Amino acid sequence: MNITPVSKNTTEPLACIENIDNHIYDYSPSNEEPKYLKRSKSESTTKLSRQLPRTPSNKYHARNKRRPYSTTPPISLNIPSSPFIHSEFSLNSSSSESSDLESLPDLSEDRDTPFSSPINRNPLTPNNSFFSFTKKNGPIECLLPKRTQISIFEIPEIVYKIVEFADIQNTAVPQEGTPIRRKPLSSNHALLIYGDKKQAELSLQDHYDEHNNDGMLFNCLQVNKLFNQVTTEIISQKFFFSDEMKLHSFLQNLKITQIKSKPSLFVFHKLFHAKQDIIELIKSHMDFSNLQWLEFYMCPKLLPTPEFLSCGTKIKKIVITGSKVIDDGFLSMVAKKCPNLEVLDIRACELISDSGIYQIAKRCTKLTTVNFGRKNKGNLITDSSICILIRNNPNLKTVGLAGCHITDKTLWDLAIRCSDHLQRLSLNNCPHITNQSIPLILHSNLFKNISVLELRFANQITNFKPIIEFKRRQEFRGISILIEVCESLCLMMREQELEMDKVISQRIFEDISYWANDNNDGDVPYQSFINSRRHK
């Protein structure tokens, strides 16, 4: 038998499949028995130990020292079957050489015994056998695509939703909360409102809403690269500060990092000592083309520059309260650049007058919330500008005119044009409002959706009977309404309410008495009723 190599693959052996001949060797049977082949004890192919690979054991190495290594080359186990081969090399225990084989130890039970003679490893044969390599790294497995599992934390859309939800749940923008009702002016005022001493004492105390910000977005920055990128993008959309020390620390780092952010929200909250230099520094490092919410709450020395309104068509909310530098010129600039403005709150800006509000009224026609309340210089805001603003903005829901010198004319315009939408109306300290406006408007059943009406120190209003009746009608409809008045007006309102209750009680009693004492009330007399029952 001659085995001659046909081809060689120096890079990678061919694949081995049991039913396919790879033609690595040409096999030609001959009559001569090869001299280098040696018979060995047969093993049953049905045993499980025959099917599993073996590793040399210590017992095998000890026995192998007494035997010289075979110099025969490795023979492929995938030799084609033929009758000659089966008869020539049959390894059956019933052969004539059984006596010689009985003297050898039984290796069938030795689990660490290999099937073939040991082979010296060299660069040409790095593995135990040719088939051990092909089974591990066959070409079929190499051609199959590798299965990769994508985590949900690697999908940008899902990560953006996760971080956005974390931002909504944990990020608290500093702003003034809307109180359920204003703090009473005195202890007697609190007793008049609540009627209970404990509740009156609680109402006079200051309540602060504590928000637990545990740095959720900071943790999101450290998840992976995608989380860091998405979180940085979301953080850059909101720029707000309520602590001057933190603001100065940020500005120092801003000079070094040269960050260029694009916020949609810009809020400064109660920075009483901040100066205009801060605005000049910040505007050079920010792009305000996406700004929608601009708020300077109680920042008396800060003035927004024209860069803040560079893309004013996107701005929908401007809140600037307690400013000593905002004037009519700023409102004129807002009116020109912010036609889509919806919320304008400029309380306690004493330099604002009818001139600036007139410009807003002419150009901004989508307003839903306006607040021009003030304590001083209320004479600068009158009917001449407010009436035009009401006529051009019929969708007003919240109107604050505290301290302004408006008259009943403005309130009637508001009742006619904004009656269906108005929900909150503040008329505190309005000296020119009389009984010809609010009492008659509510008696006419206008302001059907109003929920808060503030009339503190509106001392010319003395007729509260229509107001009380309107409140009771709203409560009967299931709509709760809050009417805020000062202590003197509260006493007057309570007295008129008691008089109304007395009149109502007296009418109820008269109706019951008339029904009980009327002879012709339609009831059958008792004797007639008894007689009719007897006849039945």
Curated annotation (Swiss-Prot):
Gene3D superfamilies: Ribonuclease Inhibitor (3.80.10.10)
Any Pfam family matching the protein: LRR_6
GO BP annotations listed: cell division; SCF-dependent proteasomal ubiquitin-dependent protein catabolic process
Biased composition (Low complexity): 94-106
GO cellular component, one term: SCF ubiquitin ligase complex
Keywords: Cell cycle, Cell division, Cytoplasm, Mitosis, Nucleus
Similarity comment text for this entry: Belongs to the AMN1 family.
Protein name per UniProt: Antagonist of mitotic exit network protein 1
Organism: Debaryomyces hansenii (strain ATCC 36239 / CBS 767 / BCRC 21394 / JCM 1990 / NBRC 0083 / IGC 2968)
